[in-house]
């Protein structure tokens, strides 16, 4: 059973529409569907809501610590409510998936994502669920003929808003992810993963 859903991003209006905040977009949508309001909760270092989702009580969290300190917020809430790593789902932007893709998985490395790296360090575990929301990679924007030796600026890419066509694809992937949330929250995470991946995400 999933008891805590965390969306990763950076705080502040200047980051709201940037690719790195894709995790926030998903949690915002979940809060809207539940009729819940995310409020600043200092003890959890983020915006927090306790929501009733699909018949289950679920904690929603958007850390306001900046991405590379996300673990501080996650561990504070997890310890307070005695939530195990395997009961946590972290939604985050994923460079290695194209816009329009979303994948669910348990455990694994950080893939260079500083938010995941910090969460794993604070939880002393990598065994939490990740919802990877594809944003594409800046190398994909470089013509193939010019890719040899090119060094794409990843930091600049994730801190910029997606193009309109990319945003539409990302929104569609988030909708598909939301459609399997009832299954995941009730503890049928493997089934939710199969449904999401089968639906072309």
Swiss-Prot record:
Taxonomic lineage of the native organism: Bacteria, Pseudomonadati, Pseudomonadota, Betaproteobacteria, Burkholderiales
Predominant place of localization: cytoplasm
BP terms from Gene Ontology: protein quality control for misfolded or incompletely synthesized proteins; rescue of stalled ribosome
Gene it is expressed from: pth
Function: Hydrolyzes ribosome-free peptidyl-tRNAs (with 1 or more amino acids incorporated), which drop off the ribosome during protein synthesis, or as a result of ribosome stalling.
Keywords: Cytoplasm, Hydrolase, RNA-binding, tRNA-binding
Site, Discriminates between blocked and unblocked aminoacyl-tRNA: residue positions: 10
Identification of the protein by name: Peptidyl-tRNA hydrolase
EC numbers on record: 3.1.1.29
Keyword NAD among UniProt keywords: no
Organism: Burkholderia pseudomallei (strain K96243)
HAMAP family, per the entry: Pept_tRNA_hydro_bact
